[in-house]
Amino acid sequence: MPVLRVPVVALAVVLASLAGAPLSAQVRLADESDRAAFRAWFVLLADAQFERATPDVADCAALIRHAFREALRAHTPEWVRRSALPFAPQFADVQSAPKAGSGGWPLFQISDGPKPQFAEFADARTLIGFNTRPLGRDTKALRAGDLLYFRQPGQKEPDHLMVFVGRSMFDAEGDDWVVYHTGPTPDGPGEVRKVRLATLQQHPAPRWRPLTSNPQFIGVYRLAVL
């Protein structure tokens, strides 16, 4: 089944100020410093799920939604306390991030058309289809915060995403770390796992290797806000 894609809006925009428009995960952050701040927070928060899981992360898409949402928050001392991180990150906040409203925080585009819809929830296929842009199938294109997309036909949940961390703040060695949630398994709720890209490329099951020779590896995708 082909991946649903829409053009990415790359123009500078004034987020969350135009007639109450939501911040779309399909719209690139206008300021380079905001993109750098978002990337730093997103990568850290995805990586941190391996160190201390949070109850809202139950599958691969939930891990990405969590890191995306929390990266946009104001990282106050109270936020740091509640986050249970082992240290207080010194990253700048995303200055153009909107505040959550009374109707929630619909960050993710979930439909196409003249009036696209936005929601707080988006599954793996929707995240890829409406909220990222493809970079091809060569992992040399990976930057920290990019996604690895696999599609496994025959599985109940065929679409699977992993986050490329690169250099981890929790590991002294390695610059090619990848983190992901397995999703529920027949034996339980699943878990967050972390692996080096080089190791993943030699996975015992070839269908999970991020290689151009693997038809189940769809490719590398970048969050459209970046």
Where are these regions (language model features)?
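Low-complexity, Gly/Ser/Thr/Pro-rich intrinsically disordered linker/tail segments
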Residues: 175-226
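N-terminal secretory signal peptides that target proteins for export/translocation
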Residues: 1-4
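Residues at the start of alpha-helices and the adjacent loop-to-helix junctions
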Residues: 17, 56-59, 137, 154
